[in-house]
Amino acid sequence: YKYIFGGTDKTDYNLPFKGFLNLPAPITWHLSKIITPAGHEIEFTYEIMPFQINGNMSFCISLDALFWQTAMSYDYELLAPVQLATVKDVTDNKILARFHYSPSTQLPYDSQYAWETCMDHGPATFFTKEKNFTLNKLNSVVILDKINYQFTYTNSSTERLKLKTLTKTTPSGTQSTYSLNYFPNHLPGYNTGHYDNLGFNNGENFSYYFSKEFFENAIFADKQIAEGKEYTNKRMGDKGGFRVTAEMLKSITYPTHGRTEFIYEPNVISSMVSADRKTVQSAHLPYPGTPDYTYPGGLRIKEINNYDSNDELLTRKHYYYTKEFTPTTKGGVSSGILSFTPQYLWGWQLYNLLKSQNGGPEYYTLNAIMSQASNPLWYNSRGEYIGYSKVIECNEDKNGKLIDGYTVHTFSNFGQGYMDEDPIAILNNKFSREYPPHFGTPYSPYTPCSSNALKRGMLLSKEQFDYAGHVKQKELFEYTPIQK
């Protein structure tokens, strides 16, 4: 088979905000044609979508940043994307699939963008105009001009866009509808500061950290430390589990009128990867004045319940994320490991080569609050945010009693043999931290490493137990890297 990608009208383009005088650059080449060994051709056509904005912002408050404007970092781009319109069998001259779209109605970005006061030269116009950008939704997919799949969505400017129904219509006119239901509590507005370490809603509003006054006051060391601790506490997860489930999928109702219900609970961890990414430590932050960090943020599936059309429970799968499970207690210490240390307040000593060679101080002191914590390696090293070493799956009745024993799944996780590895060599690697005290280590969250993320999260064993906790069956899994 031969796969052909790209083409002027089959490519996404972008235009960097900081390089607005540049020409648009191609960033994604979509599949345009498939040719079989027999010469049969399938062609994909696309249509232009409305322009979009993509990017991120972060802040760093440092004692050396005397002007609050210098502490802001932003990286945005203008996107010119395309969307799939048709799939055509060129050889047989027939349309295999058609895709139809329309503008969506959903929660927009605030017209008074929270970050505009932190720009060097006043508000950035395209930020304040971001609410005017149109986001399309997929309305229907038609297969062979015979089978029609239709999609309906929420239609409100006060909530995120969510799929409500999927309806299949056959050539004979028979319809089958799947309905999706969500938790009714709404997420807050965009860029308002209501999020935990993993980006989930936790109800804490720390948007005042984006104000000019905060940046001006935070150049004082004592205030900066106090603000840094408060910021850290506000990034903790929602222990109660109400806010973190906002607008999450709650249930699916099938054409038979049966349904599947999803029950969630907050993530709970017992360990976290140290800030220098060398060890696994207990779930506590490395400086005083901060609480236990066993609730880092986000949520996990707790139960999956299936009901018939009369609302009678058919099956229930209950998941336990613990190291030591017994049929009687069903609890214990969490097997969860956070892939980073959620540290936002830093006191650094950075090695200064030039000064040390000229009789000056060897280290340069820097104190800072950083909005991105100690996770700069999220995108090339961390793997998952949280890894669970053991997950127990139980089939239970409506009273929570085991029906046919339970199954223990063991996964590879941070620890011996699965930590990221040192680079072969690195320049200027002298690094230490004043706050919290940690002197002389050559490692930091920013030290390059060889990632072992692909080794983590792999199923190592699957054990089936009876009611009394006796092993009935055990499977072991081994993996060999293709190359290293």
Question: Across the structure, where does each feature detected by a protein language model lie?
Answer:
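Conserved catalytic cores of ATP-dependent inositol ring kinases
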Residues: 1-484
